[in-house]
Amino acid sequence: MVRMTKNVLVSVAWPYANGPRHIGHVAGFGVPSDVFARFQRMRGNNVLMVSGTDEHGTPLLVQADKEGVSVQELADKYNRQIVEDLTGLGLSYDLFTRTTTSNHYAVVQELFRGLHDNGYMIKETTLGAISPSTGRTLPDRYIEGTCPICHADGARGDQCDNCGNQLDPADLINPVSKINGETPEFVETEHFLLDLPALADSLTAWLKGREDWRPNVLKFSLNLLEDIRPRAMTRDIDWGIPIPVEGWQDNNAKKLYVWFDAVVGYLSASIEWAWRTGDPEAWRTFWNDPETSSYYFMGKDNITFHSQIWPAELLGYAGRGSRGGEVGDLGELNLPTEVVSSEFLTMSGSKFSSSKGVVIYVKDFLAEFGPDPLRYFIAVAGPENNDTDFTWDEFVRRVNNELANGWGNLVNRTVSMAHKNFGEVPVPSALTDSDQRILDLAASTFDSAGADLELSKFKNAITQIMHVVGEANAYIAEQEPWKLAKDETQRERLATVLWTALQVVSDCNTMLTPYLPHTAQKVHETLGREGIWAASPQIVEVTNESPRQPVGVGLPDPEHTYPVIMGDYQAQAAKWERIDMVPGTPLNKPAPLVTKLDPELGETGPEWAPVQS
């Protein structure tokens, strides 16, 4: 049966540009999305994977003050660091950009104008939280207090994680600023609010059709509709995107809410990718074609913005609420096919926190261990469905027992014996039941693991693949090719056993490619194959040019340069299918594939790592 090519948009949460990435960040948004995108490309699908650094909002202003630099200098610094972190991890973005671009400003303003013209942006006087010491607006998430509904402590100004209800900062009992602990002042201020109640029926109908979502995501999203209210989409702040309304766009003291603009980034990045690759309308394939599937990857703390705010923006822009309206110039834009949310990766039971010293930075981790051990750990032991605690002991155990003793051992001893005894892929003779059994298991796992990957069940899929690795090692132990090699009368049998093992190594390497792309490239070459098997992302320096221009004051410098992540992933050979091991193909002598770690590392971690409690 011929499989039809699909268009797949992979939208990845935008990391906030106030510091380098730690492993908790990439466990939630980074590795799962890349495994999914690489798998979809291997299936022959047309994939667009986009993201970028989120660079607006009060937290960036606060951090810039701490470091004694301008907010743009701070954004530039951490944008580059994050780009380097994610490239080093092998995250295969078609475009990883940033929110301080002329293109992003213009696309965000177009979405706001469409919502405003259709009547879904309503102007109201609200109570805004202000820091008494700085006079700056305090973001909802930077205010904590007691929930007025369930009375749980630690509720944020946007929602209570304990009961799931949406809140306003002024609702909290005994609110305090997370930045400096002071009690905020609440002052009257005029803002534009997204009229969520006018979009509630459309949101509800759409969400109730998402029965294939992860149960926790769907339940949380439906619960948000029980107390839906208009939500402010502008802020009293001088750093952000101008509000494209006459009388507002030249007011440098009011800007669009950072979360209104951040979620539009998936669209603006797609538009930027299209014109940077020479086909300015190519983005429409992923946004206007209703047959396209779109997947959004993030941590669980961002579900609200992806299952309520962003869909509401898209519905309102298309005039699909109780107020009606016209479809904007960008056309009717696709709603998310699935919101794929991960739980939290913790350390010693605590959330990763740079300020509290509970942090393992991606850069340090990569320098010590390389990318694939971290990618493997996140895939097999990460927070896919539950909060997961990272310990050095568990990391060392997984690397040594599963990657080194399991996968690395299978590759090295299989290829070493074949190289030593034949120098090439040997010619098999008649297969025994044992030979056929392991070959059939590997072949069937393409289907079963592939089905799990289609559903973003990354743990299930890699567990199945590593089961084949274990069975292949057991097959070799049972067949004892080292003994066959000593008996000249068993040379045909030796050739058959090693050909069988090589075929299973090839199959497992193919299936592990989305998880371990760097290792997969090495195995590909060891098996005597040439060319790019698993393509790597590249850092490209670009200028802030844009065919779309924003309006207002405080706009990005059109000549500003910055790094983006791109890649030629069409050049890779990897396909999600068995590649026959052709007898006579020269083999290369294998180098150790996975370095075993000192068991003592499991007790203390590296010298640079925080002490485990």
Swiss-Prot record:
Function of the molecule: Is required not only for elongation of protein synthesis but also for the initiation of all mRNA translation through initiator tRNA(fMet) aminoacylation.
Residues engaged in binding ATP: S354
Enzyme class of the recorded protein, top EC level: ligase
One Gene Ontology biological process: methionyl-tRNA aminoacylation
Catalytic activity: tRNA(Met) + L-methionine + ATP = L-methionyl-tRNA(Met) + AMP + diphosphate
GO molecular function, one term: ATP binding
InterPro entries: Anticodon_Met, M/V/L/I-tRNA-synth_anticd-bd, Met-tRNA_ligase_1, Met-tRNA_synth, Methionyl/Leucyl_tRNA_Synth, MetRS_core, MetRS_Zn, Rossmann-like_a/b/a_fold
Species this protein is from: Corynebacterium efficiens (strain DSM 44549 / YS-314 / AJ 12310 / JCM 11189 / NBRC 100395)
Cofactor(s) listed in the protein's UniProt record: Zn(2+)
UniProt main location, coarse: cytoplasm
Keywords assigned: Aminoacyl-tRNA synthetase, ATP-binding, Cytoplasm, Ligase, Metal-binding, Nucleotide-binding, Protein biosynthesis, Zinc
GO cellular component: cytosol
Motif ('KMSKS' region): 351-355
Disulfides per UniProt: none
Residue ranges of the motif 'HIGH' region: 15-25
Entry note: cofactor: Binds 1 zinc ion per subunit.
Compartment(s) where it occurs, according to its Swiss-Prot or TrEMBL record: Cytoplasm
NCBIfam families: metG
Keyword set includes Metal-binding: yes
EC number(s) from the headed UniProt entry: 6.1.1.10
Superkingdom: Bacteria
Binding site for Zn(2+): C147, C150, C160, C163
Subunit structure as annotated in this protein's UniProt entry: Monomer.
Zinc in keyword set: yes
Similarity remark: Belongs to the class-I aminoacyl-tRNA synthetase family. MetG type 1 subfamily.
Protein name: Methionine--tRNA ligase
